């Protein structure tokens, strides 16, 4: 692979376009255009800021991109972002850091490993177990914020690579509602959704009730084995979700919101690998019927104490179930796996200096408690339990040193504890192991921001990220082993510009990451700590109007990574991190024929990247361009949309595993094939 950054034709065109598109006005809000950065409010760093004021590298998917049904899952919504790679059955990889980390597959059970990217919905962290499921369905979502780089100071656990923060819509005082029906050409794929909201007691009590049901099939072609016939629907995927909110506002200073949400997904979800001899026949390497259920009850309290102080409280309880039934050529080779989790989240934050011209900030207390029980029955037999908890005090203060200059300092001190029991019938014996981990960590953050004009802001920041150590089973050595925590020090400089009254928006971040103890999967498939590795790169995103009826939007990411030192994994020294394409780029163009009728065309390019840390050529993937096309008719009452995903029907790999004794045909993961769909939404 190339040793220097390279620009393909897509990026050259995009850069040239960004340089020449000056002037003109943004389309009106009712034309469903992208918002200006200074009007987008993000909340994923424990405080409300405009996107222009945020010093992290943040990309936002707002409701204008979510409402037409073209994006079916969180993974699809993130796939066009700079320096983000979405792999099958995985949380997103950011800046060359595997989002799953050591938590992929069996390691998630044997050692309770944690993912490196946290996903939060309305402030509540979502569990990740072995294989990504449960991210389908984006109905009634306000926006998705994607933070690249460590967010450990804000979120603590499993945020060393970044965080995805999703906000759902709040109850309204005005009565409103909507229903939607959507269809895709994936064999009877039907998406139905509805929402209703309004006041029960005027200005005092409001509600919101939303629901979505997706019934369809995936693009896999699973065979039914003659040696083990079944009547199970191997390719079905059914998803249902319901969310109810009740907002109580007895005064202008107090708001209490009760939320209950339930989610279930069953069928052909998770990782999709296909036999490599005929990969685009989509015959799966293995077959599993996944089952995910989640029930969450949460209370949010926002109380304004006086002009200087306010209090935010979040209390949430979650019941979470994850599992699968395997389907194999022989019934004796099948296993049924299940995991039950209950967890409690408490986060209390005091905001201060709300009316102070010199300083403002917050201090908070956070508590998380998780209990798990898991088992596998059948060809593979194991069981165990897990008790994990964390307690943290965190805070952040900003000092306005002058009208233009602001200094921000933050710190999180967190105590993490984990006790995990793992028992497995292994080669004639019973393996009994225990992981007993506890650690106190300090996660600082320092940033400085300078407003060089009303239009442009510059900033520089430094922060620290952390992910806990764990344990895992080495099948080859017949040994249960332990590995240490990993940390990263991240340094960034960047700028945000909103030019010509919001006509042009440009965001840029330059970053450097220094990793210590990076948790890596060795060539023996053993999680190993790499003493020293680094990465650096750039993210640029921009939006601009071209006249009154055209809008250009694009972005690109440049990335270089290197493993500098590893005594336990010497073959990897000097290599790239896996899932680290040197270039990711996107370019889109929107045109309004009328105030209501809009067409959008976008393309996303992902450079080639290695699939392992030994950088074997047989595992290189990437080097593909995915194109999307949509046409939307949007009025006060109707939203009618037709779209094509992967419009040019690109065939490419996101993962490759060569032929071996274990996999005589090899296997691959592929980009989703061309999909044509439409949706109709009626608002009232």
Tell me the role of every PLM-derived stretch.
Residues 82, 107-111, 116-117, 122-148:
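Short acidic/polar hinge/loop motifs at secondary-structure boundaries
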Residues 246-252, 259-261, 366, 386-513, ...:
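Structural signature of Gram-negative outer-membrane beta-barrels, strongest in the C-terminal barrel
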Residues 300-304, 310-328, 451, 457-461, ...:
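Membrane-embedded beta-barrel scaffold of Gram-negative outer-membrane proteins
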Residues 605-612, 632-684:
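C-terminal beta-signal and adjacent terminal beta-strands/loops
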Residues 77, 92-93, 120, 134, ...:
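N-terminal periplasmic accessory domains that precede
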Residues 231, 235-370, 492, 505-507:
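Outer-membrane beta-barrel domain signature, strongest for Gram-negative TonB-dependent receptors
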Residues 407, 415, 512-514, 529-614, ...:
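Gram-negative outer-membrane beta-barrel transporters
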Residues 176-178, 184-216, 220-221, 225-267, ...:
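Transmembrane beta-barrel wall of Gram-negative outer-membrane proteins
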């Amino acid at each position: 692979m190339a040793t220097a950054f390279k620009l393909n034709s897509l990026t050259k065109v995009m850069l040239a376009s960004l340089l020449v598109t000056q002037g003109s006005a943004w389309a009106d809000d009712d034309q469903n255009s992208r918002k200006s950065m200074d009007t987008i409010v993000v909340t994923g760093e424990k405080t409300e800021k405009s996107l222009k004021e945020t010093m992290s590298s943040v990309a936002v998917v707002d409701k204008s991109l979510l409402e037409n049904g073209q994006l079916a899952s969180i993974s699809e919504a993130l796939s066009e972002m700079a320096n983000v790679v979405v792999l099958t059955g995985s949380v997103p990889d950011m800046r060359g850091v595997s989002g799953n980390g050591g938590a992929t597959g069996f390691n998630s059970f044997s050692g309770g490993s944690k993912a490196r990217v946290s996903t939060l919905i309305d402030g509540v962290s979502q569990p990740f177990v072995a294989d990504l499921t449960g991210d389908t369905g984006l109905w009634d979502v306000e926006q998705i914020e994607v933070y690249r780089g460590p967010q450990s100071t804000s979120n603590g656990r499993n945020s060393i690579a970044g965080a995805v923060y999703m906000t759902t819509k709040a109850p309204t005082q005005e009565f409103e509602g909507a229903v939607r029906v959507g269809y895709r050409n994936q064999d009877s794929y039907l998406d139905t959704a509805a929402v209703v909201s309004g006041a029960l007691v005027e200005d005092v009590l409001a509600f919101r009730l939303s629901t979505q049901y997706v019934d369809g099939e995936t693009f896999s072609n699973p065979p039914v084995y003659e040696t083990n016939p079944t009547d199970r629907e191997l390719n079905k995927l059914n998803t249902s979700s319901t969310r109810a909110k009740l907002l109580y506002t007895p005064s202008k200073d107090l708001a209490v919101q009760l939320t209950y949400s339930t989610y279930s997904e069953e069928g052909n979800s998770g990782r999709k690998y296909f036999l490599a001899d005929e990969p685009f026949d989509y015959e799966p390497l293995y077959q599993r019927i996944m089952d995910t259920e989640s029930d969450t009850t949460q209370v949010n309290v926002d109380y304004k104490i006086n002009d200087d102080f306010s209090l935010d409280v979040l209390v949430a309880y979650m019941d979470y179930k994850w599992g699968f039934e395997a389907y194999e050529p022989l019934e004796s080779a099948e296993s049924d796996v299940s995991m039950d989790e209950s967890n409690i989240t408490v986060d209390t934050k005091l905001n201060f200096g709300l009316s102070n011209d010199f300083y403002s900030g917050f201090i908070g207390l956070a508590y998380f408690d998780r209990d798990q029980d898991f088992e596998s029955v059948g060809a593979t037999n194991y069981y165990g339990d897990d008790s994990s908890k964390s307690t943290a005090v965190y805070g952040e203060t900003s000092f306005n040193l002058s009208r233009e200059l602001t200094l921000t300092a933050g710190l999180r001190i967190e105590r993490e504890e984990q006790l995990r029991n793992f028992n497995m019938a292994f080669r004639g014996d019973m393996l009994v192991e225990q992981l007993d981990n506890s650690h106190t960590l300090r996660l600082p953050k320092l940033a400085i921001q300078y407003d060089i004009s009303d239009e442009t802001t510059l900033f520089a920041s430094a922060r620290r990220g952390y992910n806990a150590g764990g344990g895992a089973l080495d099948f080859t050595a017949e040994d249960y082993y332990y590995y240490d925590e990993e940390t990263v020090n991240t340094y960034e400089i960047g700028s945000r510009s909103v030019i010509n009254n919001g006509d042009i928006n440009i965001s840029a971040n330059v970053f450097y990451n220094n990793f210590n103890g990076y948790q890596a999967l060795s060539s023996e498939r053993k999680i190993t700590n790499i003493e020293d590795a680094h990465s650096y790169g750039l993210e640029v995103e921009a939006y601009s109007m071209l006249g009154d009826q055209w809008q250009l939007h694009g972005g690109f990411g440049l990335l270089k990574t290197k493993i500098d030192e590893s005594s336990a994994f010497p073959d990897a020294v000097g290599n790239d991190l896996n899932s680290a394409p040197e270039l990711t780029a996107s370019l889109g163009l929107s045109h309004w024929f009328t105030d209501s009728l809009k067409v959008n065309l976008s393309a996303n390019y992902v450079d080639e990247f290695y699939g392992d840390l030994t950088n074997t050529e047989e595992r290189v993937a990437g080097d593909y361009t995915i194109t999307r096309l949509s046409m939307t008719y949007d009025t006060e009452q109707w939203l009618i949309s037709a779209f094509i995903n992967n419009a040019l029907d690109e065939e490419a790999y996101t993962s490759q595993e060569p032929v071996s004794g274990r996999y005589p045909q090899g296997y691959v993961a592929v980009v989703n094939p061309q999909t044509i769909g439409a949706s109709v939404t009626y608002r009232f």
